[in-house]
């Protein structure tokens, strides 16, 4: 499996996470529809920004999730959101309850 963490800060980050929270079903359909999708988590950070974590079966899936996320942010966030800092790589462990 492959994971990507997208971390948002600065202009537009707070609005972005407000929208993610309010439009949860839309995000679930958008990112959950990526081929090879495994899981998605979004969380706010203490500094007013936040991060998302997407896990897919392979890098092709995480690349597609990033493309979809960027398009969604561009179309739905009125403030100019800074591009996210990203960290990605192959997973060494993944589990859930």
Question: What annotation goes with each model-predicted range?
Answer:
Residues 1-51, 57-71, 77-97:
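Short S/T/G/P-rich N-terminal loop/turn motif that feeds into the first structured element of a domain
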């Amino acid at each position: 499996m492959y994971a990507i963490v997208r971390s948002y800060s600065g202009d537009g980050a707070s609005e972005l996470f407000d929208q993610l929270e309010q439009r949860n079903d839309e995000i679930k359909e958008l990112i959950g529809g990526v081929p090879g999708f495994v899981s998605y988590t979004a969380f706010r950070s203490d500094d007013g920004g936040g991060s998302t974590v997407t896990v897919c079966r392979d890098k092709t899936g995480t690349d597609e999730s990033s493309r979809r996320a960027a398009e969604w942010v561009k179309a739905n966030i009125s403030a100019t959101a800074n591009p996210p800092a990203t960290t990605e790589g192959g997973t060494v462990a993944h589990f859930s309850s």
